[in-house]
């Protein structure tokens, strides 16, 4: 990319696999690759790409690295433990990357969606949440305001929750979806 398209100055990581399971019923011996794919897509790949692009982007006059995490990075959903954990790890990495690149022109932006009505996890599995258009408008508003961490609705609230509020939210989410 840096050789054939040197004008590229924005990288958006919007990868996501969300698998729901109970750890007591999961067969990690026979099916580890099933779980490993989620870790690779949600955490390993975006971190790797960020590290590959950072040196080139740091030389540019303006550049943006945007990582899409999730409101579940802050209030994990117990039946999607790997998804929640990988998005929390990507949040942590984004914060670290933002600090390391703070003396360059690179903006590191994190977008943390709430539940959005998409087909995340497969057709028909994720048909609840805010409409995509409404969510997108909220994200563009956050970008226009120059925010570095952008949530919407419940995820905006989760970005600033106290530890006690997080514990209560996690319990409520689990009781709703288990």
Tell what function each PLM region has.
Residues 110, 118, 122-164:
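C-terminal helical subdomain
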Residues 11-12, 16:
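Conserved hydrophobic beta-strands of the Rossmann-like cofactor-binding core
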Residues 1-7:
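Conserved amphipathic alpha-helix within the SDR
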Residues 70:
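Residue(s) in the substrate-gating loop at a strand-loop-helix junction
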Residues 50, 86:
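Active-site helix of classical SDR
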Residues 76-84, 96:
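Active-site loop-to-helix junction immediately N-terminal to the catalytic Tyr of the SDR YXXXK motif
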Residues 18-36, 79-82:
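Conserved mid-core segment of classical short-chain dehydrogenase/reductases
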